[in-house]
């Protein structure tokens, strides 16, 4: 297994510059990461720069709060795909989940899945803000809505992926969906812990450091 292909090389800071985007694109080409994950404003450029490579372009929808309307998330998804996005990481309506308005949460996800038109959709449930029951419910709603992945975190809510959350999410979705761990995965040890817990994709800005750690530890 090429572990670089488990990494979405990520740059989602609001002050990301073109120079920084160029850096992660070049790193993704060099290390053969699964994707670069960038804000929608950078999707078209990233897509142009990665044309003819195996590196996918991933973007975020309703990010980071999940509090835009379903119609906006749907339009944002279509626009991103028109600009070259191949994977979509969307944030759920967290408040609706906490209110118990589960139909709204599911409909919100379904709208993005439909707008994505067959592209991979990863659903960010923002674990740090949820109870255990809410985490389980969010995973169940994501599955019912036809998503492909559940994802732990935006990295903008004061906490990221934990081994416990990844295990819980994987136990909930089984082999029917995949789990993406993101937020705070900074080194090889974090990476290995998340994969062992059941994640099959890692979102990280530290992709290069992770792979360099992998390369330096190839003896065992």
UniProtKB/Swiss-Prot annotation:
Q: Where in the cell is it found?
A: Cytoplasm
Belongs to which family? Belongs to the DeoC/FbaB aldolase family. DeoC type 1 subfamily.
InterPro entries, alphabetized: Aldolase_TIM (IPR013785), DeoC (IPR011343), DeoC/FbaB/LacD_aldolase (IPR002915), DeoC_typeI (IPR028581)
Record field: catalytic activity: 2-deoxy-D-ribose 5-phosphate = D-glyceraldehyde 3-phosphate + acetaldehyde
What's in the GO CC field?
Answer: cytoplasm
Task: Identify the species of origin.
Answer: Staphylococcus epidermidis (strain ATCC 12228 / FDA PCI 1200)
User: According to the entry, what is the taxonomic lineage of the organism?
Assistant: Bacteria, Bacillati, Bacillota, Bacilli, Bacillales
What biological function has been recorded for the protein in this entry?
Catalyzes a reversible aldol reaction between acetaldehyde and D-glyceraldehyde 3-phosphate to generate 2-deoxy-D-ribose 5-phosphate.
The question of whether Lyase is a record keyword is answered with: yes
Q: What is this protein called?
A: Deoxyribose-phosphate aldolase
The protein's GO terms of the molecular function aspect are: deoxyribose-phosphate aldolase activity
Q: Which example biological process does GO assign this protein?
A: deoxyribonucleotide catabolic process
Protein keywords: Cytoplasm, Lyase, Schiff base
